[in-house]
Amino acid sequence: MEKLASLYHHHLATLQARAQTVLARHQLDALLIHSGELLTVFLDDHDYPFKVNPQFKAWVPVTQVPNCWLWVDGVNPPKLWFYSPVDYWHNVAPVPESFWTEEIDITVLRNADDIGQLLPSQRERVAYIGYAPQRAQDLGIRADNINPQSVLDYLHYHRAYKTDYELACMREAQKTAVIGHRAAHEAFLSGMSEFDINLAYLTATGHRDIDVPYGNIVALNEHAAVLHYTQLDHHAPSDVRSFLIDAGAEYNGYAADLTRTYSAQSDGAFALLIKDLNQEMLALIDTVQAGVRYTDYHIQMHQRIAKLLKSHQLVRDISEEAMVEQGLTSPFLPHGLGHPLGLQVHDVAGFMQDDRGTHLAAPSQYPYLRCTRVLEPGMVMTIEPGIYFIESLLAPWREGELCQHFDWQKVDALKPFGGIRIEDNIVIHDGRVENMTRDLNLA
């Protein structure tokens, strides 16, 4: 904990420096960052699960408490109004005492509506960051200072560069997720249903289903062809062929995002395809370095997918280069290579080229790529190639001048397996890449 306290001290200094810069640039006095508010279910008396403002948890690891406020001026210690009501109906989070609290000026807020009386009275040059704009208006924040885009652009852009504290938190999230993945794999081998595999994952990680950073994808057989499958059947299929799990964890608000695919049989075409895709993925990661645009690695992965499709005789009589140029790899890999990772699973500013918000869209050929930035030290990315057998994407290729290049018998034989996705989380360093996932020996 002492090490984390030291890392947090330097993390806070970095955030303070960023705050000073953005406040001076936009002639603002302070940022007022709101943790968020509870949203009540329509025509009911209970609330949706609370999700904290990511810009709030960047400063303090308070992730489950609504109605908290941070006042940041970049010079003085950030002031936190921590919501702790007198309430016997609901659990009330204790006022924090942890590795980070000596750095923050904490005041207890008993009544959420009292915040207006407690904030500094001069708010004409204060920017509100949060998802309750009406609350900001009620506090006297000017309309053009409610989530000002230029301020958000600056904050989002620099969030790509993780501090050592953030990297430490993300490594802890990896450890938890890896424990869950191993438990889920054992549950799969024992013949459990998707629903029960998911329970095994949550139990092993100590998460509730509302605590994981995104809805777990636990897919058997053809369900793996649905990229964001979250149905969770209660009954295992009579013939189990494959298992894809895309599931993460959180630590102090920072996410892990891991995917693995397994074959029920250790031999056969599908098992070999998993093995070979894994090798191509690791080979690609070995080439990753700072100074290269992420888009280039996405295109390189399509070239590697073309190589696999040819070597497994799913596509024939056409060069690998022509396969990529003609788009034959796209129905097998319809999503991007990966995305920035951090406080959010799909972390912000993947397309942002500078801290003033200059946007570089994904290439038209690959519209679902989530990052076009040049990789730099401190960035954390996912690398998650896949090969899927999705009929709605394959159907247009069953006719036309290129259809003869597909071995449809072999393609159709793999459709009952759904597809493959393998995902690691990597850190870009100066001169090397850290694979946080493989460092924990998750094969």
Curated annotation (Swiss-Prot):
Details of cofactor binding: Binds 2 manganese ions per subunit.
GO MF annotation list: aminopeptidase activity; metal ion binding; metalloexopeptidase activity; phosphoric triester hydrolase activity; proline dipeptidase activity
InterPro entries in the cross-refs: Creatin/AminoP/Spt16_N (IPR029149), Creatinase/aminopeptidase-like (IPR036005), PepQ_N (IPR048819), Pept_M24 (IPR000994), Peptidase_M24B_aminopep-P_CS (IPR001131), X-Pro_dipept-like (IPR052433), X_Pro_dipept (IPR022846)
EC number(s) per entry: 3.4.13.9
Gene Ontology biological-process annotations: proteolysis
Keyword terms, alphabetized: Dipeptidase, Hydrolase, Manganese, Metal-binding, Metalloprotease, Protease
One Pfam short name: Peptidase_M24
Enzyme class (EC, first level): hydrolase
Reaction(s) this enzyme catalyzes, per UniProt: Xaa-L-Pro dipeptide + H2O = an L-alpha-amino acid + L-proline
Names of required cofactors: Mn(2+)
Signal peptide positions on this chain: none
Gene Ontology, cellular component aspect: cytosol
Binding residues for Mn(2+) 1: D257, H339, E384, E423
Keyword hit for Ion transport: no
Positions contributing to Mn(2+) 2 binding: D246, D257, E423
Function: Splits dipeptides with a prolyl residue in the C-terminal position.
Similarity comment: family membership: Belongs to the peptidase M24B family. Bacterial-type prolidase subfamily.
NCBIfam families listed in its UniProt record: PRK13607.1 (NF010133)
Protein name as catalogued: Xaa-Pro dipeptidase
Organism: Pectobacterium carotovorum subsp. carotovorum (strain PC1)
Lineage of origin: Bacteria, Pseudomonadati, Pseudomonadota, Gammaproteobacteria, Enterobacterales
Gene responsible for this protein: pepQ
